[in-house]
């Protein structure tokens, strides 16, 4: 079973026991957290798509560690001015392990009109 979660302005496709790096979250290493903004949940062809989120779906995870990304250098130079500026930035991130995906109460994905027409023809 997999889910697509939204956190930190980004979307991640996760499954049980996945370890992912996301934007910084509060909480110490070992704390349990829950993601409730689930965009999609399912297994194979049997997937439920939210509008915008799947109702009642929850992904639980455990904080593994906090860290900082590699340094990104922002360098500005003004030619012929003997002027330059160097800045560095390291973004904070959190490493989490996905424990469980619960899809209870999700809305069913509405079938397309072509699929409905094919089902009617098969029934006749």
Curated annotation (Swiss-Prot):
InterPro entries in UniProt = bL21-like, bL21-like_sf, Ribosomal_bL21
Per UniProt, the keywords (alphabetical) are: Ribonucleoprotein, Ribosomal protein, RNA-binding, rRNA-binding
Cellular compartments per GO CC: cytoplasm; ribonucleoprotein complex; ribosome
Which is an annotated Pfam family here?
Ribosomal_L21p
Functional note: This protein binds to 23S rRNA in the presence of protein L20.
Quote the HAMAP family the UniProt record gives.
Ribosomal_bL21 (MF_01363)
Can you tell me which family this protein belongs to? Belongs to the bacterial ribosomal protein bL21 family.
Instruction: Output this protein's name.
Output: Large ribosomal subunit protein bL21
Q: What organism is recorded for this protein? A: Sinorhizobium medicae (strain WSM419) (Ensifer medicae)
Lineage in the entry?
Bacteria, Pseudomonadati, Pseudomonadota, Alphaproteobacteria, Hyphomicrobiales
